[in-house]
């Protein structure tokens, strides 16, 4: 559903930031992590709205970084490739077989992998920021090329 995708990926990000950013500004520090996707810069067939929503996350992250920099607030965008989530089931309208085929022959990333990357970025020294990080399974070269093992 297009509206749900835009509401979650774009509006949700903006609404949450609208609540937390003033608190961070008042504290003079903070770190915002936005979850994008390689789909935000590498479009795929039948993914126009999802790719557009993740491109919005990319643009919003860049703008936020500029807007909040002078307040001591860091903004990092995490852009994963293939992550095994319920998204594939939703993408294929509940067709579990089609969703499972997305990950066939590949060891995809997990939510824990993404969390580990965020934890690593968060512990970096105060003078360092990771503006964006692209994470992919070692079998994925880009959005459209995945080496599948038989």
Segments (PLM) and residue ranges:
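C-terminal helical subdomain
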Residues: 77-81, 85, 97-144
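Active-site loop immediately N-terminal to the catalytic Tyr-X3-Lys motif
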Residues: 44-48
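Substrate-binding pocket helix/loop in short-chain dehydrogenase/reductase
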Residues: 1-3
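Active-site helix of classical SDR
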Residues: 17, 53
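Residue(s) in the substrate-gating loop at a strand-loop-helix junction
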Residues: 37
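Alpha-helical segment proximal to the catalytic Tyr-Lys
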Residues: 22, 66-69
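A short helix-coil junction within the Rossmann-fold of NAD(P)-dependent oxidoreductases
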Residues: 19-28
């Amino acid at each position: 559903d297009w509206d749900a995708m835009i509401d979650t990926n774009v509006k949700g990000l903006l609404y949450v930031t609208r609540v937390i950013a003033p608190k961070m500004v008042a504290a003079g520090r903070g770190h915002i992590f936005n979850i994008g996707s390689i789909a935000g810069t590498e479009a795929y067939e039948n993914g126009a709205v999802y790719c557009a929503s993740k491109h919005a996350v990319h643009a919003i992250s860049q703008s936020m970084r500029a807007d909040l920099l002078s307040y001591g607030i860091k903004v990092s965008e995490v852009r994963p490739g293939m992550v095994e989530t319920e998204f594939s089931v939703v993408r294929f309208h509940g067709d579990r077989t089609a969703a499972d085929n997305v990950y066939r022959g590949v060891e995809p990333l997990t939510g824990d992998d993404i969390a580990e990357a965020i934890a690593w970025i968060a512990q970096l020294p105060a003078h360092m920021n990771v503006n964006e990080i692209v994470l992919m399974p070692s079998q994925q070269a880009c959005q459209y090329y995945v080496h599948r093992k038989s």
